[in-house]
């Protein structure tokens, strides 16, 4: 008999709506013993079967659901089915948009909670973010090797969130050949170098692909400021859109060096690209005090909030940085501003920008809305999957 997690009375509603998480407060008791990450059955207070998931005894998310089908076992065949289902959408998208790199598995939204897999050419980069994902590592890798024999598999499970569930950070080649130090990929007509070994996330921010493309419509003959530029994807796109100048700002010299290489790789005019290593908050104030002006500003900061206790501070940070950006824009200028914080709702982010405009003494029109690219789907029963939001704003 399998180990069972029994829900408290009345706490089954979210599972009946196929939400993939069970929080600790919903648990009445455990029947049997399960190790960290082991697969368990989840039942209501009367013993009615609801789902099968991965158990994490110390996490606020006590179980993450693998399946709502009682006949489905969690094994190599299960992972193969999920991978093949996800691949169908990515195949269509890659052909339609001319991509060689994309998110293959987007965690819960692809029915594989705690698992992220990005494909860069013939390299699969894996992040296992939960105890259940780690417990199923061998089965998942076997399924990947069978379905993608042409691909090497590289582990980037070196993210701090693993520590919350008592797991060590892991990093390195799992199968196949070692990726080059910098791997060229293609995105909307751009060639970009990505660092699988040490780059942010799995190597690159694939979720901003469509936002980078959208930037081009705003930048012709414009002066652009690219804040938190990382390896210059927005900068390359701005140059391809015909900007007169783009200034890229980041605290990482290594990222800026790759950004410069990306401009050169695309045979764009390097004299129109400036790379500044500095703190964005500090530099924006310096630019304001010097009277610098820009026509377009891209504001793509890292996540400001990890948990609810940090939300108020994050709101202040987002407001301050957007206020400074609005102050630096010429009349009619465009602010492309983003938040990748899952706890920051689109409505709250829009209000923060409105408050920033008031503090800056400017009027702002919202003219376009952004979200993560289509290879990062959001399943309808898991709204938390929509983490990236952004706006194009016209500053009066």
Swiss-Prot record:
GO molecular function: RNA binding; rRNA (cytosine) methyltransferase activity
Family annotation (PROSITE patterns): PUA
Xref: Pfam families: Methyltrans_SAM, PUA_3
Cellular component terms per the entry's GO annotation: cytoplasm
Keywords, ordered alphabetically: Cytoplasm, Methyltransferase, RNA-binding, rRNA processing, S-adenosyl-L-methionine, Transferase
Class of the enzyme per the UniProt entry, highest EC level: transferase
UniProt-recorded name of the protein: Ribosomal RNA large subunit methyltransferase I
Organism placement in taxonomy: Bacteria, Pseudomonadati, Pseudomonadota, Gammaproteobacteria, Enterobacterales
């Amino acid at each position: 008999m399998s180990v069972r997690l029994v829900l408290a009375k009345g706490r089954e509603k979210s599972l009946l709506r196929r939400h993939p998480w069970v929080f600790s407060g919903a648990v009445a008791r455990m029947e049997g013993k399960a190790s960290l990450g082991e697969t368990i059955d989840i039942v209501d207070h009367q013993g009615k079967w609801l789902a099968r998931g991965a158990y994490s005894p110390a996490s606020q998310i006590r179980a993450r659901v693998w399946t709502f089908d009682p006949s489905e076992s969690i094994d190599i065949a299960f992972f193969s089915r999920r991978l093949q289902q996800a691949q169908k959408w990515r195949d269509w998208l890659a052909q339609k948009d001319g991509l060689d790199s994309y998110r293959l598995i987007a965690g819960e939204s692809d029915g594989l909670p705690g698992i992220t897999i990005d494909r860069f050419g013939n390299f699969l980069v894996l992040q296992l973010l939960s105890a259940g994902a780690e417990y199923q590592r061998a089965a998942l890798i076997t399924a990947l090797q069978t379905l993608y024999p042409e691909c090497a598999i590289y582990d980037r499970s070196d993210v701090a969130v693993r520590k919350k569930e008592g797991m060590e950070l892991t990093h390195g080649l799992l199968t196949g050949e070692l990726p080059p130090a910098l791997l060229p990929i293609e995105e909307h007509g751009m060639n970009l170098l990505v660092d699988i070994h040490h780059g942010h996330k799995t190597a690159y921010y694939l979720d901003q692909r469509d936002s980078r493309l959208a930037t081009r419509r705003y930048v012709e003959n414009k002066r652009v400021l690219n804040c938190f530029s990382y390896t210059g994807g927005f900068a390359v796109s701005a140059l391809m859109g015909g900007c007169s100048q783009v200034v890229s700002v980041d605290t990482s010299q290594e990222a800026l060096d790759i950004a410069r290489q990306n401009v050169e790789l695309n045979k764009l005019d390097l004299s129109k690209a400036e790379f500044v290593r500095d703190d964005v908050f500090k530099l924006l104030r310096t630019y304001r005090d010097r009277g610098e002006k820009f026509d377009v500003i891209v504001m793509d900061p890292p996540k400001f909030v990890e948990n609810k206790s940090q939300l108020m501070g994050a709101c202040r940070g987002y407001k301050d940085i957007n206020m400074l950006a609005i102050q630096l824009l010429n009349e009619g200028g465009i602010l492309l501003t983003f938040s990748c914080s899952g706890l920051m709702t689109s409505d709250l982010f829009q209000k923060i920008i409105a408050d920033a405009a008031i503090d800056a003494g400017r009027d702002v029109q919202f003219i376009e809305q952004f979200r993560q690219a289509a290879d990062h789907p959001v399943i309808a029963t898991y709204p938390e999957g929509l983490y990236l939001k952004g706006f194009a704003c016209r500053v009066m």
